[in-house]
Amino acid sequence: GPPFSNGNLHMGHALNKSIKDIIVRSHAMRGYCTPYIPGWDNHGMPIESAIIKQNKLNRKKMPVTEFRSACHEFAQHYVDVQSEGFQRLGALGDWAHPYLTMNPSFEAEEVKVFGRMYQRGYIYKGLKPVYWCPHDETALAEAEIEYQDDPCTTVYVKFPMYDDLGKLSHLDKSKLNFVIWTTTIWTLPGNLAIALHPQEEYAVVRADGGEMYIMARPLVEKVMKIGGVEHYEIVETHPGAFFENMLASHPFLPKTSRLVLADYVTMDSGTGCVHTAPGFGADDYQTCLRYGMDMVVPVDDQGRHTDYAGKYAGMKTEESNPVILADMKESGALFASEEIVHSYPHCWRCKKPIIFRATPQWFCSVESFKDEACAACEDVRWVPAWGKDRMRSMILERTDW
C-alpha cells in the first residue's frame, strides 16, 4: 500500500520503493505499459499521532474542524517532503500527478463504495469486544497489534458459593469457593460469570481448616501447590455441567457471578474455572450472549474504570491492578498470586499496552463474500505457489472487520 504522509523517509521506505522501482522498470524495458502513479495515505491515527507529538497539540481542546485542518496541512507537507526524497532515490513515476487519499474526489469514491456495501448488507453497527488503545482512544484491527513480553501479576481469586441450587446441601456452603485465575486483574469488576467445561471433572477440595475450593480435577495438585496448601483432600467430583446456573458471590462487589458452560475451557493452565467478563473478551461476550446476560463495560474510552467498578471508579486499568490486588489480600479473597512474563498486545502506533473492550463500532461483515473471495484466488497465478493456500486460509479465518 501507499506510505503514510506522517514524517520523513526511513530505510524501510527506501527498500520498498527501490524494489517497486526495479519491478516497474524491468517490465517497461520488456515492452509492457507500466506507468507508476505514486500515492499517499493521508488518513488515520499515524497522521494524528505524529502531529500531536510534533506540534504539541491538545486535540481535546481544539475544535474538530481546526484539528482536521492542521492534520491536512501536516499531511500535505510530508507528501512534498517524501516525494522529493523518492525522486532523489531515482524512482521512476508520475510525481507531478500523485493520488492522495485526502483529495475530495478520492474521498467521494470511497463514500460511494461504502454506500454500495451498506446497501448490500455488508455494513452494520454492533457492540462487540475489540482491541482498544486507551492512549489513542481508538479501536484497532488485528493487523495493528504488536506483541511484546510484559511482566504480569497473575491471580487466583475465590468466588464464594452463593446459591448451589440445593445440589451441595450436604456441604457447608459458607466454606465453598470457586477459584478462578486471570492475568488481567483490572477486568474483575466486569465479571458476570464463571465458565466451566461441561464434560471435564471438577473437584471439591477441602483444605486444613475446613475451607473448600472448586476447581478442575486435573489441575488440583498444581493449583494447591501454588496456593501453598500442603494438606488437602478431594471430597467429591462432578462434571462441569453439574454446576451450571449456580451463583457465586463476587469477591469485592455487591453482585453475583453465574456458573456457565463453554467448550473452550482448557485444562492446560489456570483452574478450569474461567473468569468471564463479556465487556472484555470475545469468548466471554459470546458465552454471556448465549445465556441472555446483559453487556457490562466498566471501562471508558481512556481506559478508566466507570462508576460500575465502585471504589475503583476513575482509576486507569494499570493503576487499579495493585490496588485491587492489595484489597483482595486484605479481605481474604486472594487464594494465590504469581509473577510471570507473558506476551501481551501493544498498539503499533503508540507502542503502549492495549485492552480488549466492547464498544459500539461499525463493522464490515465478511461471511457473505468469503466464498467469492476464495474463488477469486483460483484466478491468480501465485509466486510462490503456496501463497494461494496461505491467502485462502487467511480469508476463511477472517472475522468481521
Task: Kindly label every feature range from the protein language model.
Residues 1-210, 277-290, 294-309, 321, ...:
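N-terminal, positively charged nucleic-acid-binding surface of large information/translation enzymes
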Residues 180-183, 217-233, 318-332:
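Short, basic/low-complexity N-terminal boundary segments at the transition from targeting/disordered tails
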Residues 174, 267-271, 357-358, 385:
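Short glycine-enriched loop/turn motifs at secondary-structure junctions
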Residues 243-245, 311-321:
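A glycine-biased structural micro-motif
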Residues 216, 383-384:
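Generic structural signal for alpha-helix starts
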Residues 189, 193, 200-273, 282-286:
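Protease-associated
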